[in-house]
Amino acid sequence: MSAHIINGTEIAAAIREEIRSEVIALKAKAGIVPGLATVLVGDDPASHSYVDSKIKMCQNLGIYSEHHPLPQNATIEDLLTLIAKLNADPKISGILVQVPLPAQISESLVLNAINPDKDVDGFHPVNVGRMCLGEPCFLPCTPHGVQELLIRSGIKIEGTHVVIVGRSNLVGKPLANILLQKAPGANATVTICHSGTKNLPEITRQADILVAAMGKPKFITSDMVREGAVVIDVGTTCIGYTPEGKRILSGDVDFEEVKEKAFAITPVPKGVGPMTIIMLMLNTLTAAKRAAGLIK
């Protein structure tokens, strides 16, 4: 029997409507419009596409947006000056600097320069620390999206064994921190595996919930998955192009093989991907409400 397919597009659409309603209510009751500033350095086509999708989503939800493109040869001083301006702008609730950045710009310096209260990507050290302590903070968008996918699919997280394959600062580490918190929608036992892990299949087969986030197409095969497990595929790798020039994407899981063994599984595309951008919008809304003193 094939697995239940967790449709991230449908779940993200439901959250989108919730956010739209809140944005309308916030403007009507308090005269507040959330605002997102995006910053893009250089001409990377994929980065341009990601930023465009965020701008369009803002427009769709009634969130004010500004886009600040900088040339490929921009200096760290150029970027820090812009960030300081955005930090001080009351119209801007959240700031997103699209990565990767050119080699001459230190990503850590840029992240540290963003006001933690406007760090809607959730990667400022202050927000990372708050996340580890279980305090209110902006959660990184993709890991938060994974958690919401599980919760809204009715999948129990509490008391389960979650195995995450991948230890990146973007997904693996923050997701582990989110899911091990003593809180609703978390409280799991979490194991992180990586390139140095020995006997990887033995560990992944112990997972009630298996999360693949290493960026290796079809790395997770059916022999690595326990019968009846939930499999979340965070991987998104371009493996080619259609005759029309559209990207062909592959996840980290051999979907066709694993779906015959898992209880539930996310596809690629239309799985985790749509959740990332909607969590960014949710963080932007939250930032606006916090700035207005409506929530802590």
Curated annotation (Swiss-Prot):
It comes from the Bacteria. Pathway: One-carbon metabolism; tetrahydrofolate interconversion. Its EC number is 1.5.1.5, 3.5.4.9. SUPFAM superfamilies: Aminoacid dehydrogenase-like, N-terminal domain, NAD(P)-binding Rossmann-fold domains. NADP(+) binds at residues 166-168, 195, 236. It catalyses: (6R)-5,10-methylene-5,6,7,8-tetrahydrofolate + NADP(+) = (6R)-5,10-methenyltetrahydrofolate + NADPH; (6R)-5,10-methenyltetrahydrofolate + H2O = (6R)-10-formyltetrahydrofolate + H(+). InterPro entries: Aminoacid_DH-like_N_sf (IPR046346), NAD(P)-bd_dom_sf (IPR036291), THF_DH/CycHdrlase (IPR000672), THF_DH/CycHdrlase_cat_dom (IPR020630), THF_DH/CycHdrlase_CS (IPR020867), THF_DH/CycHdrlase_NAD-bd_dom (IPR020631). GO terms for cellular component: cytosol. GO terms for molecular function: methenyltetrahydrofolate cyclohydrolase activity; methylenetetrahydrofolate dehydrogenase (NADP+) activity. One of its GO terms (biological process) is methionine biosynthetic process. The keyword Methyltransferase does not apply. Keywords: Amino-acid biosynthesis, Histidine biosynthesis, Hydrolase, Methionine biosynthesis, Multifunctional enzyme, NADP, One-carbon metabolism, Oxidoreductase, Purine biosynthesis. Belongs to the tetrahydrofolate dehydrogenase/cyclohydrolase family. Homodimer. Catalyzes the oxidation of 5,10-methylenetetrahydrofolate to 5,10-methenyltetrahydrofolate and then the hydrolysis of 5,10-methenyltetrahydrofolate to 10-formyltetrahydrofolate. PANTHER family: C-1-TETRAHYDROFOLATE SYNTHASE, CYTOPLASMIC, C-1-TETRAHYDROFOLATE SYNTHASE, CYTOPLASMIC-RELATED. This is Bifunctional protein FolD. It comes from Dehalococcoides mccartyi (strain ATCC BAA-2100 / JCM 16839 / KCTC 5957 / BAV1). The lineage of its organism: Bacteria, Bacillati, Chloroflexota, Dehalococcoidia, Dehalococcoidales.
